[in-house]
Amino acid sequence: MITSLKFNNCFAFNNTIEMSLKADMRTKKFTSNVTNISDNLNILKSTAIYGPNNTGKTTLINCIKAIKGTLLNKEIHLDSNIFTGSDICEEAISFIYDNKEYSYEYKFDDKKMMYIYEKMCEIVKDQYNNEKEKLIFLKDTIDEKYECPQDEELAKVLNIASNNNILIYTVQIEKFPILEKIKTILTGIANNIEIVDMNKIPNSKTIQMLKNKDDETKKVVEFIKNADLYLEDYMYIEDLNVEIDGKVVDEKILKNQNFMDQIKIVSVYKGQAVPSIIFDSLGTRKFAALASYVIEAIEQGKTLVIDELDSSLHFKITRAIISMFNNEINKKAQLIATLHDISLLDCKRMFRKEQIWFTDKDENGTDLYSLKEFSYAENGVRDTSNIQEKYIKGEFGAIPEPDLISTLLEVDNEEI
Protein backbone atom coordinates (compact mmCIF):
# COMPACT_ATOMS: atom_id res chain seq x y z
CA MET A 1 0.00 0.00 0.00
CA ILE A 2 1.13 3.53 -0.74
CA THR A 3 1.47 5.82 2.28
CA SER A 4 2.54 9.04 0.55
CA LEU A 5 3.52 10.58 -2.79
CA LYS A 6 5.65 13.62 -3.50
CA PHE A 7 6.46 15.28 -6.83
CA ASN A 8 8.27 18.42 -7.90
CA ASN A 9 8.85 19.95 -11.34
CA CYS A 10 7.08 17.08 -13.10
CA PHE A 11 4.79 17.81 -16.06
CA ALA A 12 2.27 20.46 -14.87
CA PHE A 13 3.61 20.45 -11.30
CA ASN A 14 5.95 23.43 -11.11
CA ASN A 15 6.28 23.23 -7.33
CA THR A 16 6.23 20.51 -4.69
CA ILE A 17 3.04 18.45 -4.54
CA GLU A 18 2.49 16.09 -1.60
CA MET A 19 -0.26 13.58 -0.95
CA SER A 20 -0.57 11.58 2.26
CA LEU A 21 -2.56 8.37 2.33
CA LYS A 22 -2.16 7.90 6.06
CA ALA A 23 -5.33 8.02 8.12
CA ASP A 24 -5.89 10.67 10.78
CA MET A 25 -5.40 8.70 14.00
CA ARG A 26 -7.75 11.08 15.84
CA THR A 27 -10.71 10.24 13.59
CA LYS A 28 -12.77 7.23 14.63
CA LYS A 29 -15.34 7.57 11.85
CA PHE A 30 -15.50 4.92 9.10
CA THR A 31 -12.78 2.68 10.54
CA SER A 32 -13.64 0.21 7.75
CA ASN A 33 -12.07 2.72 5.33
CA VAL A 34 -8.69 2.19 6.97
CA THR A 35 -6.14 -0.64 7.05
CA ASN A 36 -4.31 -1.01 10.34
CA ILE A 37 -0.62 -1.81 9.80
CA SER A 38 0.50 -1.27 13.39
CA ASP A 39 -0.66 0.47 16.55
CA ASN A 40 0.44 3.83 15.19
CA LEU A 41 0.02 3.40 11.45
CA ASN A 42 -3.29 3.31 9.59
CA ILE A 43 -3.51 3.57 5.80
CA LEU A 44 -6.46 4.84 3.77
CA LYS A 45 -8.07 2.21 1.56
CA SER A 46 -9.33 4.76 -0.95
CA THR A 47 -8.70 8.31 -2.07
CA ALA A 48 -10.87 10.50 -4.32
CA ILE A 49 -9.32 13.40 -6.23
CA TYR A 50 -11.51 16.24 -7.56
CA GLY A 51 -10.79 19.40 -9.50
CA PRO A 52 -11.44 21.28 -12.74
CA ASN A 53 -10.13 20.02 -16.06
CA ASN A 54 -6.46 20.70 -16.74
CA THR A 55 -5.46 21.28 -13.11
CA GLY A 56 -3.26 18.25 -12.46
CA LYS A 57 -5.42 15.20 -11.75
CA THR A 58 -4.09 13.26 -14.72
CA THR A 59 -0.62 14.65 -14.07
CA LEU A 60 -0.71 12.97 -10.66
CA ILE A 61 -1.58 9.66 -12.34
CA ASN A 62 1.22 10.13 -14.88
CA CYS A 63 3.71 10.76 -12.08
CA ILE A 64 2.72 7.49 -10.41
CA LYS A 65 3.05 5.78 -13.78
CA ALA A 66 6.58 7.19 -14.12
CA ILE A 67 7.58 5.84 -10.70
CA LYS A 68 6.23 2.41 -11.55
CA GLY A 69 8.01 2.37 -14.90
CA THR A 70 11.28 3.51 -13.36
CA LEU A 71 11.22 0.81 -10.69
CA LEU A 72 10.45 -1.90 -13.27
CA ASN A 73 13.07 -0.70 -15.76
CA LYS A 74 10.43 0.20 -18.35
CA GLU A 75 10.58 3.03 -20.84
CA ILE A 76 9.10 6.05 -19.08
CA HIS A 77 7.72 9.44 -20.04
CA LEU A 78 8.76 12.05 -17.48
CA ASP A 79 9.13 15.71 -18.43
CA SER A 80 10.13 18.69 -16.32
CA ASN A 81 7.81 21.67 -16.10
CA ILE A 82 8.44 24.04 -19.01
CA PHE A 83 8.08 27.20 -16.88
CA THR A 84 10.59 26.52 -14.10
CA GLY A 85 13.80 26.63 -16.11
CA SER A 86 14.96 23.44 -14.40
CA ASP A 87 15.48 20.05 -16.05
CA ILE A 88 15.37 18.13 -12.76
CA CYS A 89 12.23 16.10 -12.02
CA GLU A 90 11.80 14.92 -8.43
CA GLU A 91 9.64 11.94 -7.47
CA ALA A 92 9.17 10.20 -4.13
CA ILE A 93 6.99 7.40 -2.82
CA SER A 94 6.50 5.91 0.64
CA PHE A 95 4.88 2.52 0.96
CA ILE A 96 4.27 -0.61 3.00
CA TYR A 97 6.13 -3.77 2.10
CA ASP A 98 6.07 -6.85 4.32
CA ASN A 99 4.49 -4.75 7.11
CA LYS A 100 7.37 -2.27 7.11
CA GLU A 101 7.28 1.28 5.78
CA TYR A 102 9.88 2.44 3.28
CA SER A 103 10.56 5.63 1.35
CA TYR A 104 12.26 5.91 -2.01
CA GLU A 105 13.04 9.04 -4.01
CA TYR A 106 15.00 10.06 -7.05
CA LYS A 107 15.90 13.09 -9.13
CA PHE A 108 15.89 12.69 -12.89
CA ASP A 109 17.51 15.08 -15.34
CA ASP A 110 15.19 14.86 -18.34
CA LYS A 111 17.68 16.70 -20.59
CA LYS A 112 20.69 14.50 -19.84
CA MET A 113 18.42 11.48 -19.27
CA MET A 114 20.27 10.67 -16.05
CA TYR A 115 19.30 9.76 -12.48
CA ILE A 116 21.41 12.16 -10.45
CA TYR A 117 20.03 11.37 -6.99
CA GLU A 118 18.58 8.32 -5.22
CA LYS A 119 17.73 7.69 -1.61
CA MET A 120 15.96 4.82 0.15
CA CYS A 121 15.08 4.59 3.83
CA GLU A 122 13.09 2.48 6.21
CA ILE A 123 10.63 4.59 8.20
CA VAL A 124 10.76 3.69 11.89
CA LYS A 125 9.32 5.23 15.03
CA ASP A 126 11.20 6.11 18.19
CA GLN A 127 10.02 5.65 21.77
CA TYR A 128 8.03 8.88 21.51
CA ASN A 129 6.24 7.72 18.35
CA ASN A 130 8.10 10.19 16.14
CA GLU A 131 8.96 9.03 12.62
CA LYS A 132 12.65 8.59 11.85
CA GLU A 133 14.46 7.69 8.64
CA LYS A 134 16.80 4.71 8.80
CA LEU A 135 19.03 5.11 5.76
CA ILE A 136 19.37 2.11 3.44
CA PHE A 137 21.37 3.86 0.73
CA LEU A 138 22.12 7.31 -0.65
CA LYS A 139 23.52 7.99 -4.12
CA ASP A 140 23.83 11.74 -4.46
CA THR A 141 25.86 12.91 -7.46
CA ILE A 142 24.91 16.54 -6.80
CA ASP A 143 26.63 16.87 -3.41
CA GLU A 144 28.81 13.79 -3.99
CA LYS A 145 27.50 11.79 -1.05
CA TYR A 146 27.46 8.01 -1.27
CA GLU A 147 26.32 5.92 1.68
CA CYS A 148 25.11 2.42 2.48
CA PRO A 149 25.39 1.81 6.24
CA GLN A 150 24.66 -1.93 5.96
CA ASP A 151 27.26 -2.63 3.27
CA GLU A 152 30.48 -0.62 3.07
CA GLU A 153 31.56 -2.45 -0.08
CA LEU A 154 28.42 -1.32 -1.90
CA ALA A 155 28.98 2.23 -0.65
CA LYS A 156 32.40 2.21 -2.33
CA VAL A 157 30.94 1.54 -5.80
CA LEU A 158 28.03 3.97 -5.63
CA ASN A 159 30.11 6.84 -6.98
CA ILE A 160 31.20 4.86 -10.06
CA ALA A 161 27.83 3.26 -10.82
CA SER A 162 26.19 4.50 -14.02
CA ASN A 163 23.60 7.26 -13.78
CA ASN A 164 21.76 6.10 -16.90
CA ASN A 165 19.40 4.05 -14.74
CA ILE A 166 18.53 3.60 -11.09
CA LEU A 167 20.93 1.68 -8.85
CA ILE A 168 19.24 -1.72 -8.92
CA TYR A 169 19.76 -1.90 -12.69
CA THR A 170 23.33 -0.56 -12.91
CA VAL A 171 25.15 -2.74 -10.36
CA GLN A 172 25.35 -6.54 -10.32
CA ILE A 173 23.01 -7.40 -7.48
CA GLU A 174 24.53 -10.89 -7.10
CA LYS A 175 27.62 -9.31 -5.55
CA PHE A 176 25.64 -7.40 -2.93
CA PRO A 177 22.90 -9.23 -0.94
CA ILE A 178 21.56 -5.92 0.40
CA LEU A 179 21.02 -4.72 -3.17
CA GLU A 180 19.10 -7.87 -4.02
CA LYS A 181 16.80 -7.17 -1.06
CA ILE A 182 16.39 -3.56 -2.18
CA LYS A 183 15.42 -4.68 -5.68
CA THR A 184 12.89 -7.17 -4.28
CA ILE A 185 11.25 -4.42 -2.23
CA LEU A 186 11.18 -1.78 -4.99
CA THR A 187 9.98 -4.07 -7.78
CA GLY A 188 7.52 -5.60 -5.34
CA ILE A 189 5.70 -2.33 -4.67
CA ALA A 190 5.86 -1.38 -8.38
CA ASN A 191 4.27 -4.67 -9.45
CA ASN A 192 1.59 -4.12 -6.83
CA ILE A 193 0.39 -0.92 -8.55
CA GLU A 194 -2.11 -1.15 -11.42
CA ILE A 195 -2.91 2.00 -13.41
CA VAL A 196 -6.04 2.39 -15.54
CA ASP A 197 -7.34 5.21 -17.73
CA MET A 198 -11.10 4.75 -18.06
CA ASN A 199 -11.12 6.66 -21.35
CA LYS A 200 -9.00 3.99 -23.01
CA ILE A 201 -9.26 0.98 -20.72
CA PRO A 202 -8.34 -2.31 -22.42
CA ASN A 203 -10.48 -5.37 -21.75
CA SER A 204 -7.56 -7.76 -22.28
CA LYS A 205 -7.29 -8.52 -18.54
CA THR A 206 -11.00 -9.40 -18.31
CA ILE A 207 -10.74 -11.54 -21.46
CA GLN A 208 -7.79 -13.44 -20.00
CA MET A 209 -9.64 -14.03 -16.73
CA LEU A 210 -12.67 -15.31 -18.63
CA LYS A 211 -10.41 -17.67 -20.58
CA ASN A 212 -8.88 -19.06 -17.39
CA LYS A 213 -12.23 -20.36 -16.10
CA ASP A 214 -11.10 -20.38 -12.46
CA ASP A 215 -12.39 -18.89 -9.20
CA GLU A 216 -11.42 -15.37 -10.26
CA THR A 217 -13.41 -15.89 -13.47
CA LYS A 218 -16.52 -16.64 -11.44
CA LYS A 219 -15.99 -13.56 -9.30
CA VAL A 220 -15.51 -11.31 -12.33
CA VAL A 221 -18.68 -12.64 -13.96
CA GLU A 222 -20.69 -12.26 -10.75
CA PHE A 223 -19.29 -8.76 -10.29
CA ILE A 224 -20.50 -7.79 -13.77
CA LYS A 225 -23.89 -9.45 -13.32
CA ASN A 226 -24.44 -7.88 -9.90
CA ALA A 227 -24.02 -4.38 -11.32
CA ASP A 228 -27.68 -4.56 -12.38
CA LEU A 229 -26.94 -4.09 -16.08
CA TYR A 230 -29.79 -6.46 -17.04
CA LEU A 231 -27.19 -9.08 -17.95
CA GLU A 232 -27.93 -12.73 -17.26
CA ASP A 233 -24.40 -13.87 -18.06
CA TYR A 234 -21.10 -12.71 -19.50
CA MET A 235 -18.64 -15.13 -21.07
CA TYR A 236 -15.88 -15.91 -23.52
CA ILE A 237 -16.84 -18.55 -26.11
CA GLU A 238 -13.68 -20.13 -27.53
CA ASP A 239 -15.32 -22.04 -30.38
CA LEU A 240 -17.64 -19.25 -31.48
CA ASN A 241 -18.01 -19.18 -35.27
CA VAL A 242 -17.64 -15.79 -36.92
CA GLU A 243 -19.86 -15.23 -39.94
CA ILE A 244 -19.66 -12.59 -42.67
CA ASP A 245 -22.46 -12.51 -45.23
CA GLY A 246 -23.75 -15.77 -43.80
CA LYS A 247 -20.44 -17.60 -44.25
CA VAL A 248 -18.22 -18.86 -41.43
CA VAL A 249 -14.83 -17.14 -41.57
CA ASP A 250 -11.66 -19.04 -40.70
CA GLU A 251 -9.77 -17.42 -37.80
CA LYS A 252 -6.54 -17.75 -39.78
CA ILE A 253 -7.99 -15.40 -42.36
CA LEU A 254 -8.84 -12.77 -39.75
CA LYS A 255 -5.44 -13.29 -38.05
CA ASN A 256 -5.89 -10.44 -35.54
CA GLN A 257 -6.20 -12.30 -32.23
CA ASN A 258 -7.30 -9.20 -30.35
CA PHE A 259 -10.16 -8.68 -32.80
CA MET A 260 -11.19 -12.33 -32.48
CA ASP A 261 -11.16 -12.05 -28.69
CA GLN A 262 -13.46 -9.01 -28.85
CA ILE A 263 -15.93 -10.91 -31.02
CA LYS A 264 -15.92 -13.94 -28.71
CA ILE A 265 -16.99 -11.94 -25.65
CA VAL A 266 -20.74 -12.40 -25.39
CA SER A 267 -23.46 -11.05 -23.14
CA VAL A 268 -26.63 -13.00 -22.40
CA TYR A 269 -29.98 -11.22 -22.38
CA LYS A 270 -33.18 -13.23 -21.84
CA GLY A 271 -31.36 -16.42 -22.71
CA GLN A 272 -29.92 -15.01 -25.94
CA ALA A 273 -26.12 -14.74 -26.33
CA VAL A 274 -25.03 -11.69 -28.33
CA PRO A 275 -21.62 -10.11 -29.11
CA SER A 276 -20.83 -7.62 -26.36
CA ILE A 277 -18.91 -5.33 -28.72
CA ILE A 278 -22.09 -4.82 -30.79
CA PHE A 279 -24.93 -4.94 -28.28
CA ASP A 280 -23.50 -3.55 -25.02
CA SER A 281 -23.29 0.17 -24.28
CA LEU A 282 -19.96 1.93 -23.84
CA GLY A 283 -20.55 2.14 -20.09
CA THR A 284 -21.27 -1.59 -19.84
CA ARG A 285 -18.14 -2.46 -21.82
CA LYS A 286 -16.03 -0.13 -19.68
CA PHE A 287 -17.42 -1.66 -16.50
CA ALA A 288 -16.74 -5.18 -17.77
CA ALA A 289 -13.15 -4.20 -18.62
CA LEU A 290 -12.71 -2.63 -15.17
CA ALA A 291 -14.16 -5.65 -13.37
CA SER A 292 -10.99 -7.73 -13.66
CA TYR A 293 -8.82 -4.93 -12.27
CA VAL A 294 -11.11 -4.45 -9.26
CA ILE A 295 -11.37 -8.16 -8.48
CA GLU A 296 -7.62 -8.65 -8.87
CA ALA A 297 -6.88 -5.68 -6.60
CA ILE A 298 -9.24 -6.93 -3.88
CA GLU A 299 -8.04 -10.54 -4.11
CA GLN A 300 -4.31 -9.76 -4.25
CA GLY A 301 -4.17 -6.61 -2.14
CA LYS A 302 -3.04 -4.31 -4.95
CA THR A 303 -3.15 -0.54 -5.29
CA LEU A 304 -5.48 0.35 -8.15
CA VAL A 305 -5.00 3.82 -9.64
CA ILE A 306 -7.84 4.95 -11.93
CA ASP A 307 -8.08 8.12 -13.98
CA GLU A 308 -11.71 9.26 -14.53
CA LEU A 309 -13.26 6.40 -12.55
CA ASP A 310 -16.78 7.71 -13.15
CA SER A 311 -16.39 7.95 -16.94
CA SER A 312 -19.54 6.48 -18.58
CA LEU A 313 -20.60 4.83 -15.30
CA HIS A 314 -23.78 5.49 -13.32
CA PHE A 315 -22.99 7.15 -10.00
CA LYS A 316 -24.41 4.19 -8.06
CA ILE A 317 -22.04 1.81 -9.81
CA THR A 318 -19.09 4.11 -9.10
CA ARG A 319 -20.20 4.34 -5.47
CA ALA A 320 -20.45 0.55 -5.26
CA ILE A 321 -16.91 0.14 -6.64
CA ILE A 322 -15.52 2.53 -4.02
CA SER A 323 -17.49 0.69 -1.33
CA MET A 324 -15.73 -2.54 -2.28
CA PHE A 325 -12.50 -0.95 -1.07
CA ASN A 326 -14.07 0.89 1.87
CA ASN A 327 -15.17 -2.13 3.87
CA GLU A 328 -13.94 -4.50 6.55
CA ILE A 329 -13.64 -7.47 4.17
CA ASN A 330 -10.96 -5.67 2.17
CA LYS A 331 -7.71 -5.86 4.11
CA LYS A 332 -4.94 -4.49 1.87
CA ALA A 333 -6.36 -3.34 -1.48
CA GLN A 334 -6.18 0.38 -2.15
CA LEU A 335 -7.94 2.70 -4.61
CA ILE A 336 -6.67 6.06 -5.85
CA ALA A 337 -9.12 7.63 -8.29
CA THR A 338 -9.80 10.92 -10.04
CA LEU A 339 -13.48 11.89 -10.27
CA HIS A 340 -15.88 14.58 -11.43
CA ASP A 341 -19.19 13.22 -10.04
CA ILE A 342 -19.93 15.43 -7.03
CA SER A 343 -22.66 13.07 -5.79
CA LEU A 344 -19.76 11.00 -4.46
CA LEU A 345 -18.50 13.91 -2.33
CA ASP A 346 -20.06 12.37 0.74
CA CYS A 347 -18.56 12.43 4.23
CA LYS A 348 -21.81 11.32 5.86
CA ARG A 349 -21.91 7.84 4.33
CA MET A 350 -18.79 7.26 2.25
CA PHE A 351 -15.52 9.08 2.93
CA ARG A 352 -13.43 10.38 5.78
CA LYS A 353 -12.28 13.98 5.25
CA GLU A 354 -8.66 12.97 4.61
CA GLN A 355 -9.80 10.68 1.78
CA ILE A 356 -10.98 13.59 -0.38
CA TRP A 357 -8.41 15.66 -2.27
CA PHE A 358 -8.62 18.62 -4.64
CA THR A 359 -6.42 19.94 -7.44
CA ASP A 360 -6.50 23.61 -8.37
CA LYS A 361 -4.47 26.01 -10.47
CA ASP A 362 -3.73 29.72 -10.47
CA GLU A 363 -1.04 32.01 -11.89
CA ASN A 364 1.46 30.52 -9.44
CA GLY A 365 0.90 26.93 -10.55
CA THR A 366 -0.92 23.78 -9.49
CA ASP A 367 -1.89 22.89 -5.94
CA LEU A 368 -3.05 19.66 -4.31
CA TYR A 369 -4.77 19.71 -0.93
CA SER A 370 -7.07 17.61 1.24
CA LEU A 371 -10.53 18.32 2.61
CA LYS A 372 -8.96 17.63 6.01
CA GLU A 373 -7.30 21.06 5.77
CA PHE A 374 -10.75 22.67 6.12
CA SER A 375 -11.68 22.66 9.81
CA TYR A 376 -14.93 23.51 11.57
CA ALA A 377 -13.31 26.30 13.56
CA GLU A 378 -11.92 28.12 10.52
CA ASN A 379 -14.14 26.97 7.65
CA GLY A 380 -17.28 25.53 9.23
CA VAL A 381 -16.63 22.06 7.80
CA ARG A 382 -17.60 19.02 9.87
CA ASP A 383 -17.72 15.33 9.00
CA THR A 384 -21.49 15.77 8.91
CA SER A 385 -21.43 18.81 6.61
CA ASN A 386 -23.00 18.76 3.16
CA ILE A 387 -19.72 18.61 1.24
CA GLN A 388 -21.42 18.66 -2.17
CA GLU A 389 -23.20 21.92 -1.41
CA LYS A 390 -20.08 23.58 -0.05
CA TYR A 391 -18.05 22.45 -3.06
CA ILE A 392 -20.62 23.83 -5.51
CA LYS A 393 -20.48 27.16 -3.67
CA GLY A 394 -16.73 27.21 -4.21
CA GLU A 395 -15.82 27.00 -0.53
CA PHE A 396 -13.01 24.52 -1.23
CA GLY A 397 -11.79 26.08 -4.46
CA ALA A 398 -10.97 23.55 -7.20
CA ILE A 399 -14.09 24.42 -9.19
CA PRO A 400 -14.20 25.93 -12.70
CA GLU A 401 -16.00 29.17 -13.54
CA PRO A 402 -16.84 28.74 -17.25
CA ASP A 403 -18.24 31.71 -19.16
CA LEU A 404 -19.25 29.94 -22.35
CA ILE A 405 -22.38 32.04 -22.91
CA SER A 406 -20.19 35.06 -23.69
CA THR A 407 -19.08 33.23 -26.84
CA LEU A 408 -22.65 33.30 -28.13
CA LEU A 409 -23.03 36.96 -27.19
CA GLU A 410 -19.86 37.85 -29.10
CA VAL A 411 -21.07 35.94 -32.16
CA ASP A 412 -24.45 37.65 -31.92
CA ASN A 413 -22.82 41.09 -31.70
CA GLU A 414 -20.65 40.37 -34.73
CA GLU A 415 -23.73 39.45 -36.78
CA ILE A 416 -25.45 42.67 -35.77
Write out the residue ranges for each language-model feature:
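Phosphate-binding glycine-rich loops of NTP-binding sites
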Residues: 41-81, 287-288, 293, 324
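Short beta-strand segments that buttress and anchor functional surface loops
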Residues: 7, 91-97, 267
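Pre-Walker A-like glycine/lysine-rich segment at the N-terminus of P-loop NTPase domains
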Residues: 1-66
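Extended helical coiled-coil dimerization/tether regions that scaffold
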Residues: 8, 200-279, 396, 400-401, ...
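Conserved ABC ATPase signature
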Residues: 46-50, 250-295, 303, 309-313
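Electropositive, glycine-dotted interaction segments
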Residues: 107-242
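Short alpha-helix of the ABC ATPase nucleotide-binding domain corresponding to the H-loop/switch region
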Residues: 314-319
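C-terminal lobe/lid and adjacent interdomain/linker elements of RecA-like ASCE P-loop ATPase modules
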Residues: 1-3, 320-416
